[in-house]
Amino acid sequence: MAMVGLFWITEGCVYLGAKPTGTAPGVRLTGEGVEVLGDGQGGRFWGWDEVRGLDVRDVAVRSSGRRLASMAFDSVVVLLTGDGEHPPLFTVCVETERDGTVEASALAAVAGGIHTPDEYALSRTLLARLADGTTPVGQLLGWRREEPEDVAPTKDQRLALLREWTTASV
């Protein structure tokens, strides 16, 4: 598994945000389509031919410096109070012709739940390309299968991958 932008990429599928466990909320992207997971929102699936758009809202976005400061502050609060939080939620909007726009929750997977502006913008562009078919999910899965399992891409590598996936022609 590897985290690139808003995407948790495994060898078999891609999650928006963290891979959910148990009854936790989430959204899974496969070669076949989009599936909403989790207690109270799960069980919905649309094939790619039904999906008209994908977008996200409520994602924490800060510059790299502000992101580090926020994470440091959160760490101090946890050390002093012992009260850690669950990862923050964000909203995934799945637009379909039949059901209109369906909103689902997903858990942030990055440290502190905060993304940089570049990651966020490129991730939203990639979501649009996944929805319109110009970038197939298989391209992300193929990259993951070729990478060593225990190696996580660096920040620069993650941004380069997002740029590659958002500019590649079909």
PLM region descriptions:
Residues 1-26, 37-43, 53-170:
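Eukaryotic intrinsically disordered, low-complexity regulatory linkers and tails enriched in Ser/Thr/Pro
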